[in-house]
Amino acid sequence: MSNNTCKIVLVGDSGAGKTCIISRFVNDRFDKSQMTTACPSFCTKEINYPKYKKTINLDIWDTAGQEIYRSISKLFYKGASIGILVYDITNQKSFESIKEYWYKELKENTEDNTCFMLVGNKADLFEQEQVKEEEAKEYANSINAEYYLTSAKNNIRITDLFVQCGIKFIDPNSNDKNNDNNDEKDGNKNFIINSGENKPKNTCC
């Protein structure tokens, strides 16, 4: 894997919105009826970080339905720099699964220097919230993960999440945080995202 390639894996219960999060970031699309395949798939997105003088390729891996059977191959996790734990804020069980299964699964199958993100998705359904943000933040702190409240449907903090993944890849100890604020003052940007469309690539035939 290239020194400029950041492998990101998303895990969590089926229905939490992992595929929709990826689709929103990579192609700026939302389709809740999007079909999954029987094997993991990945998409690639390129981000340029002028501040760091780096261009990073994000390889974003989706379990694509295998999480239903909890039979994900170790190859899925191999070489991951970032692990994103996704739960549905309207589904308490999906959050409990993160704590009881997915975090341990990630921890056991990734390197010690892998960075973790905890993502509460479906912020657009806030009135149906079952998982309180304070509870999620407390858990994120306990596992040394950064916390994000997102909505793939309304495109809330999706770009922020993945841009931050690139920053953590460049400098795991960085305290820099992207907050959906791409400063263009004096012609400078914190990041520039390649606008090309990407189609998911399956890893099995």
Labelled PLM ranges:
Residues C43, R70-L75:
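Conserved alpha-helical scaffold flanking the Walker A/P-loop in AAA+ ATPase domains
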Residues I68-I72, S94, E135, R157:
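Short acidic active-site motifs
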Residues M1-G15, T19, S23-V26, A38, ...:
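Conserved P-loop small GTPase signature centered on TRAFAC-class small GTPases
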Residues N57-I60, V86, V119:
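Generic enzyme active-site microenvironment
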Residues A80-E100, T110-N113, A123-Q130, K153:
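Conserved Switch II/interswitch segment of TRAFAC-class P-loop GTPases
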Residues T55-Y69:
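Switch II (G3) loop of P-loop NTPases
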Residues N27-M35:
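Post-Walker A helix-loop "phosphate-sensing" segment adjacent to the P-loop in P-loop NTPases
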Residues P50-K53, K74-G79, K107-D112:
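Conserved catalytic network of the ASCE P-loop NTPase/AAA+ motor domain
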